[in-house]
């Protein structure tokens, strides 16, 4: 039945095509006749002009009118010719549309054969013009796959249904694809490859179509255009959507299986998957959105850390995205499919960070370099690179003390450390911060072991976030560091250390002992009061109340490393223990390490100070920390969360002490003045 209806439809289409071709031929003849008339008119006008020229030179002025008089019939003839050519054009485009309606041809590979078939074209139109017109119509039709644009009434969209009814059989034949790909003609680019596969599968029916026609020129057109019709119908069909969904699900499933074990490889693959989904489906299909939604779910399941990292990335990019889930980041926050693509980029970012963290525990140097290269902030990356060796040393110590089992916990700790900056930015993440604090307390002992690497990464990512956010809460850490050297200038040399914070942190430690003695003299307390008061207010306003709690606990955990950087970040405690009055902070700044250990908010720091230096810090770092303990303003501890990264520089501290000591002394003089 389907065959007979198809055959009847084909006959109708052929008859319509013949009619259109006849009209086209008639229009061509008319155009030829009009052109001949124009030639005759031109000759006549030329003859008249010649006669008038020969008659006398006086009538020459009237030559223009005379030439224009014949020009008026000529102009009319030219207008008629243009009209005829336009009608011819429309007829040809109708013919092409008819062919495409019957065969689903979506672009013009067969346009030239059809022209050739219709004979030589004396018209001024070029093949390119005809093809372009036909193609625009066809593209319109392709963009509206449900109905054919401009299809003549004689060829209703029944052929579609017939074709669809007839094709399911061939469509299930997988092997028929490759052989007739030339006959198919290229599938229009916007259509994804699964549809192409469908169209190729539908090709066998096309062969039968040619036979039924009994050959001839028209069958050539049929075969040339056939496959692309299947592209059109397949593109809209539920079969194609199901197929795309299958493909995507298979890919995601494979990657899920492969990747849940090793995160970095999985992350790389997943990045590929997401992009493939977008390119293949074009981002307009609900399936595509669903798949992309599923991808983040996979991410979520594979690594809880990655989820935190995604939220951190979302907050870094400053987009007000619901932070409950990566999908919230992607689709809700970015607002649409293009936004989803942006979200894909964001996921890539955060996944790279996850990779870096995972690899960072395994290979500290690699992590340092990758973070240097890939971290959005090139400058911070450079700083990170400077401290890679310290990272390696600290991380190895951390790994030894913590063991592999605790590596993951430091990983979470890192995320929590990163989340603490995020907490400052977004009070909403306070829950995460609370969790991170909880896990931080659990990890307290291990973190004390691993606090230095954690602090390192915290500092690195703290810098990343601080500079990325541009928030003064985040910058609170670095602004306090920056502003204290800038405003205080006790640490004139510290401005340079901030340029190379990681290497110079050790130097600062060295110089801190000297400087902090002087600072305790009262200059540091005074200027810490100033900086703490100002930046403390800023950070209090900006929500470092939350951050202060989280970072206070982090300080407690990272106590000694925190002290290491306390010099540059005495103000930071100002904001963060700002639950404490600034006066208390100043007192603490003046107090020796005993005060630091006895601090109420830093009460946790006391055990951590005792524990941390022993397991983790190298012999060099330990004396530095102990020296700094008294010298550093205990109030600065919250910031040094990031400091531990730079403390590890064991060899640097001695040189740094020498270098930064005198520098800071001079700077302190400047600051005193």
Swiss-Prot record:
Compositionally biased residues, Basic and acidic residues: 392-477, 487-532
Proregion residues excised on maturation: 671-673
PTM sites of type Cysteine methyl ester: 670
Main subcellular location: cytoplasm
Lipidated residue numbers (S-farnesyl cysteine): 670
Membrane topology value: Lipid-anchor
Subcellular location: Cytoplasm; Cell membrane
Post-translational changes noted in the entry: Palmitoylated on Cys-667 and Cys-669 and prenylated on Cys-670; which is required for membrane association.
Pfam family, one: Paralemmin
Positions of the UniProt region annotated as Disordered: 49-78, 99-213, 295-343, 356-673
Disulfide bond listed as a keyword: no
GO molecular function: ATP binding
Gene Ontology terms: biological process: negative regulation of cytokine-mediated signaling pathway; regulation of cell shape; response to lipopolysaccharide; Toll signaling pathway
Lipidation (S-palmitoyl cysteine): 667, 669
Cysteines joined through disulfide linkages: none
Coiled coil: 4-49, 75-101
Transferase is among the record's keywords: no
Annotated Gly residues bias: 327-338
Family affiliation: Belongs to the paralemmin family.
Functional summary from the UniProt entry: ATP-binding protein, which may act as a adapter in the Toll-like receptor (TLR) signaling.
Subunit structure: Interacts with SIGIRR.
Protein name (Swiss-Prot/TrEMBL): Paralemmin-3
């Amino acid at each position: 039945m389907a065959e007979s209806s198809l055959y009847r439809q084909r006959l109708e289409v052929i008859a319509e095509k013949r009619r259109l071709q006849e009209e086209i031929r008639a229009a061509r003849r008319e155009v030829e006749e009009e052109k001949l008339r124009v030639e005759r008119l031109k000759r006549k006008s030329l003859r008249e002009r010649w006669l008038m020229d020969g008659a006398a030179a006086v009538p020459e002025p009237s030559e223009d009118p005379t030439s224009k008089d014949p020009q008026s019939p000529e102009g009319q003839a030219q207008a008629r010719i243009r009209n005829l050519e336009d009608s011819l054009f429309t007829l040809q485009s109708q013919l092409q549309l008819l062919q495409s309606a019957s065969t689903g041809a979506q672009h013009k590979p067969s346009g030239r054969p059809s022209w050739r078939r219709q004979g030589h074209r004396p018209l001024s139109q070029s093949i390119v013009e005809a093809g372009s017109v036909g193609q625009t119509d066809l593209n319109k039709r392709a963009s509206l796959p449900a109905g054919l644009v401009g299809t003549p009434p004689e060829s209703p969209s029944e052929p579609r249904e017939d074709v669809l009814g007839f094709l399911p059989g061939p469509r299930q034949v997988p092997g028929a694809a490759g052989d007739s790909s030339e006959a198919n003609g290229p599938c229009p680019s916007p259509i994804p490859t699964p549809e192409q596969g469908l169209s190729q599968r539908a090709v066998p029916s096309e062969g039968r179509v040619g036979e039924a026609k009994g050959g001839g020129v028209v069958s050539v057109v049929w075969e040339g255009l056939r496959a692309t019709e299947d592209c059109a119908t397949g593109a809209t069909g539920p079969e194609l959507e199901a197929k795309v969904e299958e493909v995507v699900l298979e890919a995601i499933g494979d990657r899920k299986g492969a990747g849940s074990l090793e995160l970095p490889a999985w992350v790389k693959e997943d990045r590929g998957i997401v992009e493939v989904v977008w390119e293949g489906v074009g981002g307009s299909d609900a399936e595509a959105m669903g798949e992309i939604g599923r991808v983040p779910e996979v991410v979520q399941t594979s690594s809880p850390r990655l989820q935190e990292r995604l939220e951190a990335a979302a907050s870094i990019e400053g987009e007000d995205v619901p932070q409950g889930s990566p999908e919230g980041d992607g689709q809700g926050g970015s607002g649409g499919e293009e936004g989803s693509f942006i979200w894909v980029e964001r996921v890539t970012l955060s996944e790279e960070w996850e990779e870096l963290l995972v690899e960072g525990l395994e290979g500290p140097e690699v992590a340092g370099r990758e973070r240097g290269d890939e971290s959005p902030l090139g400058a911070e990356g450079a700083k990170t690179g400077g401290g890679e060796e310290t990272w390696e040393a600290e991380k190895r110590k951390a790994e030894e003390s913590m063991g592999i089992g605790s590596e993951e916990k430091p990983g979470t700790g890192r995320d929590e450390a990163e989340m603490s900056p995020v907490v400052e930015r977004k009070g909403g993440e306070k829950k995460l911060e609370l969790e991170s604090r909880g896990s931080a307390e659990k990890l307290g002992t291990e973190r004390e072991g691993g606090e230095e690497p954690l602090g390192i990464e915290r500092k690195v990512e703290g810098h990343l976030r601080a500079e990325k956010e541009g928030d003064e809460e985040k910058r609170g850490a670095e602004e306090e560091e920056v502003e204290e050297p800038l405003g205080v200038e006790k640490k004139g040399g510290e401005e340079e250390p901030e340029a190379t914070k990681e290497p110079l942190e050790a130097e600062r430690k060295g110089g801190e002992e000297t400087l902090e003695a002087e600072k305790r003299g009262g200059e540091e307390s005074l200027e810490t009061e100033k900086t703490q008061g100002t930046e403390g207010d800023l950070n209090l306003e900006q929500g470092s109340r939350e951050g202060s709690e989280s970072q206070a606990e982090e300080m407690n955990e990272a106590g000694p490393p925190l002290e290491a950087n306390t010099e540059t970040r005495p103000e930071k405690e100002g904001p963060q223990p700002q639950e404490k009055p600034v006066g208390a902070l100043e007192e603490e700044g003046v107090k020796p390490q005993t005060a630091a250990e006895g601090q109420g908010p830093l009460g946790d720091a006391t055990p951590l100070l005792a524990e941390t230096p022993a397991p983790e810090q190298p012999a060099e770092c330990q004396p530095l920390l102990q020296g700094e303990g008294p010298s550093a303003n205990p109030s600065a501890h919250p910031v040094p969360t990031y400091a531990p990264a730079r403390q590890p520089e064991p060899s640097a501290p001695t040189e740094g002490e020498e270098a930064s000591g005198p520098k800071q002394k001079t700077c302190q003089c400047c600051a005193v003045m």
